[in-house]
Design a protein with these regions (language model features):
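Non-catalytic, mostly N-terminal accessory regions of nucleic-acid modification and defense proteins
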Residues: 1-176, 180, 241, 245-250, ...
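Conserved Class I SAM-dependent methyltransferase catalytic core
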Residues: 11-14, 18, 24-37, 240, ...
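Conserved, well-folded catalytic cores of nucleic-acid-processing
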Residues: 18, 121, 125, 146, ...
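Hydrophobic alpha-helical scaffolding
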Residues: 108, 133, 215-219, 263, ...
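Conserved S-adenosyl-L-methionine
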Residues: 158-266, 271-282, 288-293, 304-305, ...
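Hydrophobic alpha-helix feature that most strongly marks membrane-spanning transmembrane helices
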Residues: 205, 231, 235, 269, ...
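Accessory, often C-terminal, charged low-complexity segments
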Residues: 270-298, 303, 326, 336, ...
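Conserved P-loop NTPase
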Residues: 369-410
Length: 821
């Protein structure tokens, strides 16, 4: 049975994280990733006779496993890594980590246990990299990416820069339209600051026929990460070179000029200081300098040095995208001259995408993506800008683009259409009038969320028409809703009053005819989407492509809900599907791609070995809660086939809870009777309570006797009810075992598709509709409360309170205090 990918990766990280002890994550990754590498090449070597990595005798992952528990494990691992590196030209790539380093791994027994445990993590039988379960399943690549992200997150400031967040990489790959690159390996993609290579690989993944990858990285250890990453993703011909890109570029043509590429992607280190070393102010490669009429980037800030290198490295018909801090858009002096050169003289900058702050590892400052395109530069009339700073979700200490944010950016970019407060095509003439300052807020006005206080309304009452019209989004879709919530003020033109009680606003919204109509249309749109894809889902079989499936499902869902005039934003609906895909449906589809429509029950085993390394007894199922089915969850089957048995169990549990509550209340109410000093051995239990009862006088101690007998009655009822629940649950478990064994494939399909996938999505979409109702209710209540009391009313209330205070003071013998001074 295949394991869920998300469960596998989270287990990998959890085990690795536990084993690293106090070691810095930035150091520990060197050990974890190289073991993952050995596991991968060993699995591939077993199944792929054409696999290009050579494994010398005694250097397979199985040979590493054989070292577990040996006192010389570190020394032997170093030897095997050295042999693997020498055989494959990977010196200083896979043999950087020292497996004998006692400072990092501990001494003696601790070192042996740490390394044995690390190898054990990757012994997982489900971690088989020799085969992919689906046509688009990159188990190895996804595992490596997952671990890299977690290491970057844990590495802290300045140590996580080797990794570009996958969401940003996806945006770059989409806006460069790499899906149109159809020349296969003759297409070239270059990253001058490639880090671990994740951005390069994300760009490659977008191409329909592949490409050839080139990268350069200054840090030698990170070069090793990138080379391993390429091999692990099957990119054996990718070329990664080490060196300072600005001062020692490695990619040159036969004449010594910089080589050019079809696509260039980059996430260079932000604001590098003292970048100008062996490079000259009159650059020999023509990137900057007076001879080329290009300004020289300031020595204390290397952002434009990288951008100019990228511009020079793009082929005449090519394009590129670079992540840079927002400061490059508006800083003055030399950088302003370079902006003018790029925007007005060469017209290379096609667009700018402003990103949320605190997205990148190692820095919290906001950044942007600058898109450069040479092919259409001569005819370019302006720069397309997107202000995407507001779209994100908090993810630990960092911000992350949501699926809907990525899709919204890409859709607007591809359409090149203006969207109020979000995107705009800015003519070069307008940019020139602003002295080539590209700061996005100069050109895209932020949405006005400021609350304007109407002094007249505060003085004389009423709800300002301006405030009511700010809710125009709702009135356009539900015209009658406005009149159900507001009526013109009886005496004041231009002002409204609530048409219903404040506590009836939510009820009024839900009862409104237009709202009910559009809510029905919203439901109909979802039903239409389900009908459109039902047969496609029923036809899923082993070997299908889950990534292609979700692209089809999500695109059609977004298209349907864009056409639906709904209060719920279509991109919020899209996000519901993508989140459910990430959390649940993706795992289901990969299980189907691997094993087909199989619904197998199993009992999760928390661990296979005890602390003394002895095999623990397998846990046996006694209740429905003890068994699990990943594809077809047990609760769905219970609801569908055994609702009466479930009701009986719930009723018994309710009785149990009631008796336990009564027992707890009895103990609290009569603490003196249940004081442990009253019982043998100072222990409160049934036996001692019975002994206590025998010593009490029926008349003198009647109340205590009744209380103790009631205690025993509750305890007996609880025992009997627990026994009944166990019997009912065991009976239900037996029925479940039979039911799961008898399931046909058609039954499994119906339950998974209709009762699991569609039902879960329907619930999430209903939640989005209710969220809209809550938002409107909150806004209307806030508006009503803002002007609930006029200033004269407040003055009267204040005067009344002052009079009361003065009266109290007078009664107490104090002179009245003047408040009008």
């Amino acid at each position: 049975m295949a394991i869920k990918k998300s469960e596998l990766y989270s287990t990998l990280w959890k085990c690795c994280d536990e084993l690293r002890g106090g070691m810095d994550a930035g150091q520990y990754k060197d050990y974890v990733l190289v073991i993952l590498f050995v596991k991968y090449i060993s699995d591939k070597h077993k199944t792929d006779s054409d696999f290009m990595i050579e494994i010398p005798d005694g250097c397979s992952f199985d040979d590493f496993v054989a070292l577990k528990g040996h006192s010389n494990i570190g020394e032997e691992m170093n030897k095997k890594m050295a042999s693997l590196a020498e055989a494959n030209g990977l010196d200083n790539v896979i043999n950087v980590a020292d497996f004998c380093d006692e400072q990092k791994l501990g001494k003696g027994k601790d070192l042996v246990e740490t390394l044995s445990g690390l190898i054990g993590v990757f012994e997982n039988s489900d971690l088989d990299f020799g085969r992919n379960r689906a046509s688009d399943d990159d188990l190895m690549g996804d595992a490596y990416e997952y671990l890299m992200k977690n290491f970057a997150t844990e590495s802290g400031k300045s140590k996580g820069q080797f990794y570009t967040p996958a969401e940003v990489s996806r945006v770059i790959a989409k806006v460069l339209e790499l899906d149109k690159a159809r020349k296969g390996i003759s297409t070239t993609i270059y990253d001058p600051t490639c880090g671990s290579g994740s951005l390069l690989l994300r760009a490659l993944a977008e191409t329909p026929k592949g490409a050839t990858l080139y990268g350069q990285e200054k840090d030698n250890a990170t070069v090793g990460l990138a080379k391993m990453n390429m091999i692990l993703h099957g990119e054996m011909y990718a070329e990664i070179k080490q060196g300072d890109t600005i001062n020692d570029p490695q990619y040159k043509d036969g004449d010594g000029h910089l080589r050019t590429f079809d696509y260039v992607v980059a996430n260079p280190p932000f604001s590098t200081k003292s970048w100008l070393k062996s490079a000259k102010e009159e650059d020999e490669y023509g990137r900057w300098g007076p001879r080329n009429n290009i300004g020289i980037p300031p020595e204390k800030n290397g952002d434009y040095a990288f951008l100019l290198h990228i511009v020079r490295s793009i082929a005449r018909t090519g394009c590129g995208a670079c992540i840079l801090p927002h400061g490059v858009l508006f800083r003055g002096n030399a950088e302003a001259q370079i902006r003018k050169y790029l925007v007005a003289e060469k017209r290379y900058i096609k667009g700018i995408i402003g990103l949320p702050s605190n997205m990148f590892f190692g820095t919290g400052i906001p950044a942007c993506i600058i898109v450069v395109e040479k092919a259409e530069a001569a005819n370019r009339k302006g720069v397309f800008m997107i202000d995407a700073k507001a779209g994100f979700v908090k993810d630990g200490a960092k911000n992350r683009l949501r699926e809907q944010d990525i899709r919204r950016i890409v859709d607007v970019w591809q359409a090149q259409r203006d969207v109020p407060h979000f995107a705009r095509f800015v003519p070069i003439e307008e940019i020139a009038r602003n002295d080539y300052n590209l700061n996005i807020p100069r050109y895209i006005e932020a949405e006005d969320t400021e609350i304007l206080q109407d002094i007249d309304a505060h003085l004389n009452g009423g709800l300002p028409a301006h405030d009511v019209e700010q809710l125009e989004t709702y009135w356009k879709i539900c015209p009658s809703l406005k009149s159900d919530l507001f009526v013109p003020h009886a005496t004041r033109s231009g002002y409204f009053a609530l048409a219903c009680a404040q506590d009836a606003i939510r009820e009024t919204v839900n009862a409104n005819k237009d709202f009910r109509h559009q809510a029905a249309l919203f439901t109909e749109s979802f039903v239409a989407w389900c009908n459109q894809h039902r047969s496609r889902l029923y036809e899923l079989k082993p070997g299908h492509a889950p990534k292609r499936l979700i692209e089809e499902l999500s695109s059609s869902l977004l298209e349907i809900f864009k056409q639906d005039r709904s209060l719920v934003d279509a991109y919020d609906v899209y996000d519901c599907l993508m989140n459910y895909w990430s959390e649940t449906m993706q795992d289901d589809c990969y299980l189907i791609a691997s094993d087909g429509w199989k619904a197998e029950l199993y009992t999760p085993q928390p661990m296979t070995k005890s602390k003394d390394n002895k095999v623990k007894k397998a846990k046996k199922a006694a209740t429905p809660e003890d068994v699990v089915c990943d594809l077809l969850p047990v609760p769905i089957v219970i609801d569908e086939y055994f609702p009466e048995m479930k009701s009986c169990i719930l009723a018994a549990e309710e009785v149990l809870n009631d008796n336990e509550t009564k027992l707890s209340e009895l103990l609290d109410e009569h603490e003196d009777y249940f004081d442990t000093d009253n019982f043998a051995d100072k222990k409160l239990n049934d036996t001692n309570v019975k002994k206590r009862i025998k010593t009490l006088d029926k008349v003198k101690d009647a109340e205590e006797l009744d209380t103790l007998n009631q205690y025993l009655k509750y305890k007996e009822d609880i025992t009997v009810t627990k026994r009944l629940i166990r019997e009912l649950k065991y009976k239900l478990l037996s029925a479940l075992l039979v039911r799961y064994a008898d399931f046909t494939e058609d039954e499994i399909k119906r339950l998974v598709i209709e009762k699991k996938w569609f039902a879960a999505l329907s619930t999430r979409l209903d939640g989005e509709m209710q969220r809209v109702v809550q938002q409107l209710t909150t806004k209307v209540i806030a508006l009503a409360e803002r002007y609930a009391e006029t200033l004269p009313q407040i003055d009267l209330a204040l005067a009344d309170l002052e009079a009361k205070v003065a009266g109290h003071l007078k009664q107490m013998g104090f002179a009245a205090v003047r408040t009008d001074l």
